[in-house]
């Protein structure tokens, strides 16, 4: 069994409706496998599942351009089916809760169908239009419900006054942050390689902030416990220090980051600074098939390429405990799953979704 202190056992267990009711260490294992709390998918876009293999990968600006064009061609029925297929894949692969970003209907219903809990955030992207006006804010406040709220997409895609308004709320919010070097350059200088995508021929340049994305969020008082920064690939040591002091968590999405040529996120340094780091599957449009084991393996591989290796135990703690902590959930309260046919965390890291047994 995987606890916060590490792997214990062998032993026998009783689980009722996914919840661990008894653990008897030393009685001899009743199954060949490892008992773990379900995974927490710290960052997700269920609605993009049917766009897998259709987007432009490599440069992130090109990816954003392609996904905007593809979204415009999707029918509401395709979006709903995409959400349902992705939710089903998450469930079958051992995920219990998701921090979901979505700007179209379907995610809440799909998660509910498969018993997935978590937080669904309706993304606000308003830079290309007018600021998130008072009437829209009233709608957002009226929509507020357990597990659902409106929230910002990213510092580069939202008006400052809108971001400041979200900062003032006490809502649990997640925001894409420092995903690429181009994003950091855009915010610190007002221009970057994204200009053609981000601004267009008739758009005014983004006001120069002379701040990194993390510094900007700090200046607006967005950073606080209950808030999550997604990606954090291009954060500096001073950014990490700010994050650690503020109480925010981070979502690490290594397969998506690799496919979009983003810098490798300094996960070990963030965790050493006290930042809880969960693992997110992001979207199938950028990361590929929904597979938590593949995501964990890439997290380990990328950390080694960076020269700041994470241990196998680190990866499992992030997947099973730290992502849940970021949502304010005690992972040990369940549900639990069995990874069948494995006897060590190293062996379990090589598992596939087909080896997940829901209890």
Give the residues covered by each predicted segment.
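Active-site metal-binding motif and surrounding structural segment of the metallo-beta-lactamase
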Residues: 24-36, 170
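Histidine/acidic residue-rich metal-binding segments in metalloenzymes
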Residues: 26, 107-114, 135-249, 261-277, ...
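Active-site beta-loop-alpha junctions enriched in small/polar residues
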Residues: 45, 103, 123-127, 153-155, ...
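Alpha-helical scaffold segments that flank or form the walls of functional sites
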Residues: 34, 52-114, 135-143
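His/Asp/Glu-enriched, well-ordered alpha-helical/loop segment
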Residues: 196, 219-222, 265-345, 351-359
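N-terminal metal-binding scaffold of metallo-dependent hydrolase/deaminase domains
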Residues: 1-28, 325, 329
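Histidine-centered catalytic micro-motifs
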Residues: 37-49, 172-181
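Active-site gating loops and adjacent loop-to-helix segments of metal-dependent hydrolytic enzymes
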Residues: 49-81, 119-122, 181-224, 299-307
